[in-house]
């Protein structure tokens, strides 16, 4: 009942926010091709939502003169101001230096945002996952599509790629991949046992001669049958053939075992990745929700809150999919869950709507990290609000 109560509360909050913000759809804005050059490519700072006529770009010359950027190894003004503590916060520094605004309402609202916001602790501080590990997991998820399909044993033929979204099909395919070494090892024993079954079914008395006759007939087109046949007519050529065939047989078994172990390790890895993304999504959803609830009434932040809310709803959809995964420690006892694991990992890899919202959440996490650094300066009285009124020139 506790889970149902929390779900109902979440639904009430979402309904209230949707009504207040005037958001009627879960579709996120910007359906163009995703820019993969930076992690937070779909995220825009609140300043970028103000009237374009009141948004003024900063040239590279000005940013250099103001020391807003520095050479590698030196700290810029923005880095000293925001004190980024992780990769996501550091990556956002370049976005701050691109423009400034003369919109007084935005400046006043931003002062209130800084004073009223209590940013939650960074996901990387409490989760046991470092920012480098998180980014590495993301890069592995977003590797080249063909490489991704081959690495995790998905169907590579484009006309059949829809099967990669079928948990049942992926489960059967995965079990077949992992069983191939066992089947290869058992094949000789199957050949040796099968003649007994045939003779028994036919009601033929079992003797050594009848057994060998049936065995040779069954295995005549297989390596084992040919090897048994060559035993009768041993010669240097047949001996070489037997040794080569035996070597190839065991080499095939070895390759199957290596392939099976590699596949198992990859499944263990993606299981761990999904749990990290699941925990991150829970943190990100809560962070966005708290910010939107706190600042949705600020005029110049309304569009930013709307966009954040839209992406939050998509993040909720993603987390709902990942909630079925309960542990990152995949073992042989979890083999029955492989189909679901692979399907969900493929969905995260290929679904562009999910990618847009995940990239947006990384930008939002970086934004909160910058806000934490700025708040620290304010608390130490190293940074003060400037007075703004109707007579103040902007």
Question: What residues fall within each predicted segment?
Answer:
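A membrane-cytosol interface segment of integral membrane proteins
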Residues: 333-334, 339-347
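Long, charged, glycine-rich C-terminal linkers/tails
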Residues: 375-394
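Conserved amphipathic alpha-helical "coupling/scaffold" segments
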Residues: 1-324, 346-374, 385
